[in-house]
Amino acid sequence: MTWDDHKKNFARLARDGGYTIAQYAAEFNLNPNTARRYLRAFKEDTRTTDSRKPNKPVRKPLKSMIIDHSNDQHAGDHIAAEIAEKERVNAVVSAAVENAKRQNKRINDRSDDHDVITRAHRTLRDRLERDTLDDDGERFEFEVGDYLIDNVEARKAARAMLRRSGADVLETTLLEKSLSHLLMLENARDTCIRLVQEMRDQQKDDDEGTPPEYRIASMLNSCSAQISSLINTIYSIRNNYRKESREAEKHALSMGQAGIVKLAYERKRENNWSVLEAAEFIEAHGGKVPPLMLEQIKADLRAPKTNTDDEENQTASGAPSLEDLDKIARERAASRRADAALWIEHRREEIADIVDTGGYGDVDAEGISNEAWLEQDLDEDEEEDEEVTRKLYGDDD
């Protein structure tokens, strides 16, 4: 529909039904400001001098009273066309009104969260009834405004939860307050949803005031923030408690190790144990060997005592004798000489193989004698290394 059609429809509805521009814009799903701009001037033009709307259009006076029977057929056709046009306009207006109503209904159904709130309300109500059971299995009735004071039943529910989890006195007190606050906050949330639901049912359908849905959303956002804060508080308390418990276990374990080490030293003095035996006793009882005892064990293992009766050859306590040192030195020298002999023999074999296969001996690879090269004198800056030659080829070569 064009704005001309809207002007005609608005003029008819304003004349017959007393429609306002706002109502017309809502009926036809129009922008109120745009409708007001287009229809206001037309509305002012349609008013009469005495501000009364004529029920029927004013007909112009006939210029002549001459009856022209030749135009009767034309006049009848004109009246029929006007009636058909009026019916067509009425059908268009009715269809537009129905379409606008359907669109408004779809918009209201889409924006209305009555079903969501009902499901949430029912779930929270069931949870509230489930959480309001005391230790004896008795159910108490929740009254509006209970969340404003200290809820005893919430404290009882919190104590029951803490007894199942296990905690000390301080942690129990802190968690009890946090959990009771959390339960009371959930009760307040459930009550607010119920009250806003009742208020929405009682509220009339008008354009003024904040919709209840926005109030519910604001309340749920606040409750979510508070619940998250309480959950973080409870989580921090539990972590601190676990950390303190681990520290206490470590302290007890260290104190137990100190007792085991002390008992090992006492047994060492009483039974004349060695340091190694005392360390074995500590490890057998789950303790940790002290660093000083470990150093003593390492020193004893590096320098064991000798079982010789010769006091002249005996050095300081725990040190090897001079004969042992001389024997060890001779064995190592013989081992080095044997290794050197093996190395020289191996090198001789490698050089002989190179000379024989590479043609560097008396005869080259092609069978030609190398005497000319062997008899060649050394350069001025070259000297024959007789020691190396003697080691490689012997004195006879």
Curated annotation (Swiss-Prot):
Acidic residues compositional bias, start-end: 374-387
Source species, domain of life: Viruses
Region (Disordered): 42-62, 304-325, 356-397
Record GO terms (molecular function): DNA binding; nuclease activity
Keywords carried by this UniProt record: DNA-binding, Hydrolase, Nuclease
Entry annotated with the keyword Nuclease: yes
Basic and acidic residues bias (residue ranges): 42-53, 388-397
Disulphides: none
Signal peptide (UniProt feature, chain positions): none
Subunit structure and binding partners: Multimer of two distinct subunits.
Protein's job: Necessary for recognition and cleavage of the phage packaging site (pac), together with the pacB protein. Both are probably the two major subunits of the phage PACase.
Protein's name in the database: Terminase A protein
Source organism of this protein record: Escherichia phage P1
Classification of source organism: Viruses, Duplodnaviria, Heunggongvirae, Uroviricota, Caudoviricetes
Gene: pacA
